[in-house]
Amino acid sequence: MAERNLDFDKVINRKNTRCLKYDFAVKRGKPADVLPLWVADMDFETSSYIEDALVERAKEGIFGYSEVQTPYFEILANWMKLHHNWEIQEDWLIKTPGVVFALAMAVKAYTQPGDSVLIQLPVYYPFSEVIQDNGRKVVSSNLYQGEDNRYHIDFQDFEKKIVEENVKLFFLCNPHNPVGRVWSAEELEKIGDICVKNGVTVVSDEIHQDFVFKGKHQVFASLKKEFQDISITCTSPSKTFNLASMMISNIFIPNPELRRKFRKELDAAGTSQLGVLGLVATEAAYSKGEEWYQAMHAYVEANINYTKEYVEKYLPGVKMTDLEGTYLVWLDFRETGLTVEELEDLILNKARLWLDSGKIFGKAGEGFQRINVACPRATLTEALERIRKACYCSLRSQ
């Protein structure tokens, strides 16, 4: 049976499908008619092999408690070896309902109330939320933009913050959302050496690991045995195959003591088995979804290149940060001269777009907008045209 869902130009009406991306604009304070390109949720049909596997399981008609069987791990291990050159062991694996849930469990497992947790702003905003919501202190070693139009790590500041704030836990984002960096082995080794030296546990969010367009994704835990011993690696099929509603993530913790502490917090939270449909979807994705994945990856890369060309040609004063990984483009509007409030008004009310405002990723994100380009080209073109027209009208009125 051949893969059927390879038409990524196909525009699908997702309204009235209980879709967070499309159905909850008004509830979230947005105009009803906005075009949404905000949350990291692709507008593509997933692999037909996943669809078929879910339908076949649903036909069984019984949805009792479930657990994984050996093929699940073998399929997962094959994917990690093939795509990320990482050989995992079955006892490392812990399944959770999502990566953000795993971040919260890690905060509880490896820190005490009042402890400092390090992040690198601008970064995926739930990082800050799960730290603060669990009574810990957020400490940031901010990334900085270089002349090469990429973000970089200030390693001196990174270690200084760890020492001065007595940091216990570090949230690494690789690839980094929203700035699109894929950290090199050299950069990761510098981070890891500092964390090992100072007794810092590393939670590495690698959920976007299958979206790399420049460079090579390196699993942090795979680089050195010392890094493996201090790391919690968070992965999921939810981004790669657009399965967020399946509520399943695969967390790898090689260190037995770190694993024991993590499991203890899972037990305290009352989590046990995950839903059978998530398990079925994951097995189908990683065992039969390769053709779909490769085609989707190529389509998204073409959209990224198209966006770059469009911005350079039609949006003076706007810059697209060099994107190495993720399908989330980081647009810099600071040279337009618009204030944060004016930019928000331009995007939301004039362009009628629902993007992710840079300010939600921290103060370092002010003046930026994050746009999801994992959508049909027609949708992306419409969004970019709306920005162009809104910017033109804004300049004429000044």
Label every model-predicted segment.
Residues F63-D193, D210-F211, H217-E226:
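Conserved core of the PLP fold type I
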Residues E283, Y299-K308, M320-F333:
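Conserved glycine-rich beta-strand-loop-beta hairpin in the small C-terminal domain of fold type I
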Residues Q89-E90, D322-Y327, E366:
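Short Gly/Ser/Thr- and Asp/Glu-enriched loop/turn motifs at secondary-structure junctions
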